[in-house]
Amino acid sequence: MRKIILFALFTLTTLSAKAHSQEEQVNINVAGIDLAISSNGPSSPSVHTFSRHTKYRSHLALFELGFNIPTNVSYGTTEPWFNLINAKSTQYTFNVFSVGTRLSPNGTVGLSAALGITWSNYVFETPTRVQRTDGMLTAEPVDTKGWVKSKINTFALHLPILLEVGQRKGFFAAVGGYGDLVVGSRSKIKYSKHNKEINRGLNLPLLQAGVTARVGYRRVYMFGNYSLTELFRNEGPSTNILTIGLGIGF
């Protein structure tokens, strides 16, 4: 966790330094509230609320909703079990802290980064129990009597970095990458009458990374994330996750 926070602070410091050296502004968004750090020189920084005169504003939205789709699934010698209901396998992302700076004189090209949290759900089509047994990740069917749903949840710190092209208050497109620090994972089986079974600590990869693209208008956009890191370690099925969804900001 320390490494990803330090990296986020390093990114902010780098963008701020660039802005100061060029007598520009770095715009910071904290939970939907905009601030602008400006400087007429290295010794005269100031912080003020966002205004219409601000040179550049990140397009990263405060909230993103996506749907997880497994790709390149391979089970090796094990029985297939990672079959998801894609419409229910959702991902929620809150970009709590974001920063942006322009890279072109007219402000049509910019660099954005954010630090947020991501909650991912992988909902199975059939009743499935996923747990670690003797150091291995195992999956087995469970009784359908009283069964409501079974799923895997992950919780991660999220750091996207994007190169944006477009109008500050209009249409834009962006490409970049992201890194996730997975701080929690669990499987859950829910039964009727409010009964449930939870298995924690699935030992998923701590660090996950991928590529991302966005296209939209102001802070409303469609996005796609593709994980270059497999969801499971060698003990689980081989799969990369594609997430497609919508971002909404202020």
Please report, for each region that a protein language model flagged, where it lies by residue.
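Predominantly the C-terminal beta-signal and adjacent terminal strand-loop region
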Residues: 74, 198-250
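Short loop/turn motifs that connect adjacent beta-strands in outer-membrane beta-barrel proteins
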Residues: 50-58, 101-109, 124, 169-170
